[in-house]
Amino acid sequence: MKTKVGVLYGGKSPEHQVSLSTAMAVMNAIDPHKFDVIPIYITPEGQWIKGEQLTGPIEEIKQLQFTSAATALIPVSLNQVPAADSAAGGNEETIDVIFPLLHGPNGEDGTVQGLLEILNIPYVGNGVLASAVGMDKVMMKNLFAQAGLRQAKYIAVTKYDWQKRGETVYDRIERELGYPCFVKPANAGSSVGISKCKQRGDLKAAFIEAFQYDRKIIIEEAIVGREIEIGVIGNDEPICSVVGEIVPKKEFYDYEAKYEDGQTELIIPADVTKEQYETIKQMAITAFQVLDLSGLARVDFFLAEDGAVYINEVNTMPGFTPYSMFPLLWQHSGVPYPELIERLIALALERHQEKQTITYTFKKEKR
């Protein structure tokens, strides 16, 4: 009997289009002999819409952008996702596992993971806490610091602080970080809202841009060096892929460079020494464990000119587009695309089974 996989994609997020690209690639790569695939689309407005079970490859992204004429999934019944005729009183179709291919806020940040936990539905990837911390760059870096992982210096600023004490904030940046520096939304991915600042005059526009996507931003010192990434999969015993290097043709690896073909070069495996690889690997495993990650993650690093390794961030749901680093890293590590997806689904079911052994009630014995 095939495993029924509900692929969840889209979302009320700045990274909606990225999610569509990822979903198309993953659904076309899932082994149809082992899995039945049911697409579940979250519109930009937040409506959940279920499509029909796939019977063949998806040719265009627009095929995944369902309208309300398809099966709306709200309201949802606990412990299962309704099939098309459930609202009319027909048979209900239980989905075995959800594969959430959501990027950014309202999807990769623990919100959807929390819903799936309440519904007691197995799902691929990281749990509620890990997803939330993995999305919030400030909290993530605070935990990195506590774990002793080398990273760039950083400052966190809220929109309220900036509006009240803007010049003081700029003074602190110049005093503690200097130029160049990067300004980023604390809760966003895919390089959305990121700016590189070379002087004080660049900061205001960068802050305005970043605050479009979050009420909290992070400013980081620029590390001169190479951008290195590594893939991690697993639960309690995570394993690492080979490392890859990003060589952007633009000044830095922004949204367009990530998702428009030809804007960047990926070198896999990256040219690093054995010692550098071991350092990157161990730092990635430490980050995976410190953030209590499970399933998968891509961990990003800087390799400075002096050979020092700096951890940058983790991505709890890395992209699976044709140009994405994560699946390419595993292909070069001997794990083909369909097998990678199969492993992630198996890890999700394994973690869910473990959770079923936990007792959630407590009765005090009478004396």
UniProtKB/Swiss-Prot annotation:
Residues annotated to bind ATP: 174-229
Enzyme class of the recorded protein, top EC level: ligase
Cofactor annotation remark: Binds 2 magnesium or manganese ions per subunit.
Catalytic activity: 2 D-alanine + ATP = D-alanyl-D-alanine + ADP + phosphate + H(+)
Residues annotated as domain ATP-grasp: 141-346
Needed co-factor(s): Mg(2+); Mn(2+)
InterPro entries (alphabetical): ATP-grasp, ATP_grasp_subdomain_1, D-Ala_lig_Van_CS, D_ala_D_ala, Dala_Dala_lig_C, Dala_Dala_lig_N, PreATP-grasp_dom_sf
A GO biological-process term: regulation of cell shape
Binding site for Mg(2+) 2: 313, 315
Pathway: Cell wall biogenesis; peptidoglycan biosynthesis
UniProt EC number: 6.3.2.4
GO cellular component: cytosol
Keyword annotations of the record: ATP-binding, Cell shape, Cell wall biogenesis/degradation, Cytoplasm, Ligase, Magnesium, Manganese, Metal-binding, Nucleotide-binding, Peptidoglycan synthesis
Family stated for the protein in its record: Belongs to the D-alanine--D-alanine ligase family.
Protein's job: Cell wall formation.
Listed name of the protein: D-alanine--D-alanine ligase
Lineage: Bacteria, Bacillati, Bacillota, Bacilli, Bacillales
